[in-house]
Amino acid sequence: MTLRDWMRTFGEARSIDINNDLERGYEAALLIQTLELEYYGDRPIRPNLQLSVPRSLQSTILRKFHTAANICRLTFEAIKPNVSQLDSQEYRKYQLIETIVNRYAPKRSSRSTSISRAPDALPRSLLGLVDKVRRQLDPTSEATLVAGFRRRRDSTLISLKIILLLILVPLLVQQISRTYLITPAIDYLAPELPFLSYPKPQLEEQAVEKLRVFKAEIEFDALLKGDSIPSQDELQKALAIKAIQLKDEADKESTHAIKNVLADLAALIAFAFVCIINREELRVLRGFLDEAIYGLSDSAKAFAIILFTDMFVGFHSPEGWQVLLQGIANHFGFPARENFILLFIATFPVILATIFKYWIFRYLNRVSPSSVATLRGMNGSS
């Protein structure tokens, strides 16, 4: 192995260590934010503040906080020298860790505070410009940029691969299992197991309606051709033959629901299997989606939010929910009860809208205030 190979191996191992430390620190920072939101009213955690919870629970909260804060501090100190190697997504995680560390950093003495408040010899903007030029002139900057580009490219390829797997594998398993395994087995066992082809009221109603239409068609054809209307015995014989055909069709349709349930179950198992064996790829996909979503402009985020809300909880959403519920009922062999559909449409979109507004108020308002401002402006102008 040449020196270049050794250096490449060392660099990859170092990059993996940085990513692991960053993920651990980021999860600790999110834990602290969750504790702040749930127990301290979205304010900094104060160990000396008595909460309205049992003392044992408060001790557990403080123990989690101290552990997470220590992890954030160690992660911040470990990654700070290598911050120039982070991409945009990793840098956002680093910024969150830095915010938590600065928020809970021990307060300095009055003398150190006065010294820190003294004016700098050079403006910070000028120092930042000098540091930027220094990093650009660094001989290793090109290798760092290339490594970052390769990491982002690999992340994109892995994300596209896992998305295709999550979509195609369940669909293929569903169709193949239904066509070659489930359908032959159900058709073979249905005559011997009556519960597989149990009667359904909606199928009986459809069969009766088809039989009535068939009788009317016979009389209509006779009138068009100028023939005499079939006698009662001939009509009875034709209706009996048609009734047997309709019964066979209804028996076959009655097994479709069980076939659909078993095929959907097979697709769900395939989806879970893909998720289990591709845990690392799913973590990369989550980071890729975070970067794609947070990389959108404020107007694009507001547009996506308005599109989602108008589609699912907006003025025209009841018609869509009605079609969706009827399709689900037919897929699983349930009668499409109008009362249940109307009750669902009257309650579920309201609950969904409430959850969505709470998410905007508690989470999005803190993560992206400019997006919330743009959203309010677009709603106000519409």
Curated annotation (Swiss-Prot):
One of its GO terms (molecular function) is proton transmembrane transporter activity. Keywords: Cell inner membrane, Cell membrane, Hydrogen ion transport, Ion transport, Membrane, Transmembrane, Transmembrane helix, Transport. The keyword Metal-binding does not apply. The chain crosses the membrane at residues 156-176, 257-277, 305-325, 340-360. It is found in: Cell inner membrane. It holds the Pfam family CemA. The keyword DNA repair does not apply. InterPro entries: CemA. GO terms for cellular component: plasma membrane. It is a multi-pass membrane protein. Its main location: membrane. Belongs to the CemA family. NCBIfam families: PRK02507.1-4. Required for H(+) efflux immediately after light irradiation to form a rapid H(+) concentration gradient across the thylakoid membranes. Together with PxcL, contributes to transient H(+) uptake following dark to light transition. This is Proton extrusion protein PxcA. It comes from Prochlorococcus marinus (strain MIT 9313).
